[in-house]
Every structure is written in structure tokens, then in C-alpha cells.
């Protein structure tokens, strides 16, 4: 979850305006539990007309949220992003300790039918004014949640234990090349050489692609990978 300066938006056009001026008299960071997204990833099977995402306001005051989907380019404002999804509602007010469902519906598209496509769901939580802030100049910070959205064409298997059979590891110089022969995006949290973790960061490999990985050591007789399945579980196996 990232904290960003809140930028007010036009509810009619849902257009983001400029950043608040930094020339302010005070900056207030109120305690606010905020809105959370249930789950760590969204799988959208092509045969589904829509999928529902559950949000929860864990704060003790109501919050205003703005939700949108992007294709990985975070430089564009929401109103300029073009993705083949309709999200309802894009703006909503959630009461304290209350939930809200957001519906994602696929639109006519030209997405690949032989492999998954990746997008991202963003939820911007705009905190309310506290009684202490009323009438004061304050910089409010909005909290943004962003999780992966995988669009899965018909006939493509889920990410599970069988996915390991589609992963190949080869030495390359001082590093490794991991080949993903599956039609899924695969997220690898751990690469272990002789049961010692050697990767520096989480790796995400596109379907039917290979990726070079920097590791602390590639001198091993066997490799164990830990991947994240459809449900956000960490599963490991020997490669």
C-alpha cells in the first residue's frame, strides 16, 4: 500500500486534477485504517461475464474511493487509460467498518487467446477530514492499493503444483535463465540453490518467455523454486 498526496477529482468526469500545493501551513497525517482489497490477485477467466472484488473499509470513519484498471503504465491518469474492462462503481463512498463490491466486466477485445494477459486493479482511498482538521490547511495523504489482474483465456490451466513442470532453470554466466513454458504469468518469490535462497528480489516471468535472474550463487546441483498460485499461496518444488 502506497501513500500519495491526495489529488481531488471531478466526480462528473472522474478526472484527476493537479497535486495540492506544497505551500501549506501544516501537514496532518491522520490515523486511518483505510480500505483493503480482499485477496492478493484477481483471476478473470474468459468464460466469466464478470468478476466481483470485495473491498472493506477497516477505518472508523467513512472513506471515498476511486478504482481503475491499468495495463502496467503508471504514468497515465485514470481517465486516459485504455483497457478492455469496465469497472463499476469507479467511485464510491464506503461507511466505517463496511464493505463494498466492485464489478469488473470484460469488453470486446483483441487480447491473446493462447496466453494470459496482465493488468492491475488500483484502489485509491481518500480519507475523511477529522474534526480536528476542519477549517485548517492540511495535506491529506491518500492510500493506494494495487494488485495484479490476470485475464485467463479459455483452456489455460491454473497456476498450481503442475506449473513447475513448465519451468526450466539454466546457468548463464554468473546468473540464471528461467524459462516459462506455461501460458501463465508466473511469480517466483524464492530461488534456492542447495536449500539456500539466492535471488535478490521477486521474479515475474511472462507466459512462454525466459528471464535472466541475478543470483548470489549459481553453483548448485539442484534448484528449488517457490511460486505464488492462483489463491496467493506459496508453493515450492524442485526443478
Swiss-Prot record:
Its main location: periplasm. The keyword Glycosyltransferase does not apply. Keywords: Chaperone, Fimbrium biogenesis, Immunoglobulin domain, Periplasm, Signal. Induction: Expression is negatively regulated by H-NS and subjected to cAMP receptor protein (CRP)-mediated catabolite repression. It is found in: Periplasm. InterPro entries: Ig-like_fold (IPR013783), PapD-like_sf (IPR008962), Periplasmic_pilus_chap (IPR050643), Pili_assmbl_chap_C_dom_sf (IPR036316), Pili_assmbl_chaperone_bac (IPR001829), Pili_assmbl_chaperone_C (IPR016148), Pili_assmbl_chaperone_CS (IPR018046), Pili_assmbl_chaperone_N (IPR016147). GO terms for molecular function: protein folding chaperone. Residues 1-31 form the signal peptide. Disulfide bonds: none annotated. GO terms for biological process: cell wall organization; chaperone-mediated protein folding. SUPFAM superfamilies: PapD-like, Periplasmic chaperone C-domain. GO terms for cellular component: outer membrane-bounded periplasmic space. Disruption phenotype: Deletion of the operon under classical laboratory conditions does not result in any major effect on E.coli capacity to form biofilms compared with the wild-type strain. It holds the Pfam family PapD_C. Part of the yehABCD fimbrial operon. Could contribute to adhesion to various surfaces in specific environmental niches. The operon is cryptic under classical laboratory conditions, but is functional when constitutively expressed. Belongs to the periplasmic pilus chaperone family. PANTHER family: FIMBRIAL CHAPERONE YEHC-RELATED, PILUS ASSEMBLY CHAPERONE. This is Probable fimbrial chaperone YehC. The lineage of its organism: Bacteria, Pseudomonadati, Pseudomonadota, Gammaproteobacteria, Enterobacterales. The gene is yehC.
Amino acid at each position: 500500500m502506497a501513500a500519495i498526496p491526495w489529488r481531488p477529482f471531478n466526480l462528473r468526469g472522474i478526472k484527476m486534477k493537479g497535486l495540492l500545493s506544497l505551500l501549506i501551513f501544516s501537514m496532518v497525517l491522520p490515523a486511518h485504517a483505510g480500505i483493503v482489497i480482499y485477496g492478493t490477485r484477481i483471476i478473470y477467466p474468459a468464460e466469466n461475464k464478470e468478476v466481483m472484488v470485495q473491498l472493506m473499509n477497516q477505518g472508523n470513519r467513512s472513506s471515498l474511493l476511486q478504482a481503475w484498471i491499468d495495463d502496467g503504465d503508471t504514468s497515465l491518469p485514470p481517465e486516459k487509460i485504455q483497457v478492455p474492462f469496465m469497472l463499476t462503481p469507479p467511485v464510491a463512498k464506503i461507511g466505517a467498518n463496511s464493505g463494498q463490491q466492485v464489478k469488473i466486466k470484460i469488453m470486446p477485445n483483441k487480447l491473446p487467446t493462447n496466453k494470459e494477459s496482465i493488468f492491475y486493479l488500483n484502489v485509491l482511498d481518500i480519507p475523511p477530514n477529522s474534526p480536528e482538521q476542519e477549517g485548517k490547511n492540511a495535506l491529506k495523504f491518500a492510500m493506494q492499493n494495487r494488485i495484479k489482474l490476470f485475464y485467463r483465456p479459455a483452456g489455460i490451466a491454473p497456476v498450481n503444483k503442475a506449473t513447475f513442470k513448465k519451468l526450466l532453470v539454466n546457468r548463464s554466466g554468473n546468473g540464471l535463465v528461467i524459462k516459462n513454458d506455461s501460458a501463465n504469468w508466473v511469480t517466483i518469490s524464492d530461488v534456492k540453490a542447495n536449500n539456500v535462497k539466492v535471488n535478490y528480489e521477486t521474479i515475474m516471468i511472462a507466459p512462454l518467455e525466459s528471464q535472466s535472474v541475478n543470483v548470489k550463487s549459481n553453483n548448485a546441483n539442484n534448484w528449488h523454486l517457490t511460486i505464488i498460485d492462483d489463491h496467493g499461496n506459496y508453493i515450492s518444488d524442485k526443478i
